[in-house]
């Protein structure tokens, strides 16, 4: 079983290998934070309106603007983080493929090309899923708890 230190070291090594664009990553995470903030502001406006038993035109406009801003910021964040995830996977495949090519001839005799290709594609797809789905989902959930 993996220990916490092993996981952190593995993620650090993966970070060094893949060299993600930190500027884009920062922008994506900031946009995610902003989108989450707007989405959490909407229920507060509605709650206040329900407590006062009236929903003015101004509040409706603010709610619509918040929905729009949530959509824009969350959409841009998802696009940027997805793009970064694909670049990370591309780098992982490149690094892995270059290592496979440099392995001795005896290794290639023991392992079929189709098996190596299948492993490379499937393993990087699993890493893609972690970065693109589970990381973004856990980050969004964390934002909700932080802002609540």
Swiss-Prot record:
The keyword Membrane applies. Its main location: membrane. It is found in: Cell membrane. It is a multi-pass membrane protein. This is Uncharacterized 16.7 kDa protein in epiA 5'region. It comes from the Bacteria. GO terms for cellular component: plasma membrane. Residues 25-148 form the ABC transmembrane type-1 domain. SUPFAM superfamilies: ABC transporter transmembrane region. The keyword Cell membrane applies. InterPro entries: ABC1_TM_dom, ABC1_TM_sf, Type_1_exporter. Gene3D superfamilies: ABC transporter type 1, transmembrane domain. One of its GO terms (molecular function) is ABC-type oligopeptide transporter activity. The chain crosses the membrane at residues 26-46, 60-80, 127-147. The gene is epiY. Keywords: Cell membrane, Membrane, Plasmid, Transmembrane, Transmembrane helix. Pfam families: ABC_membrane.
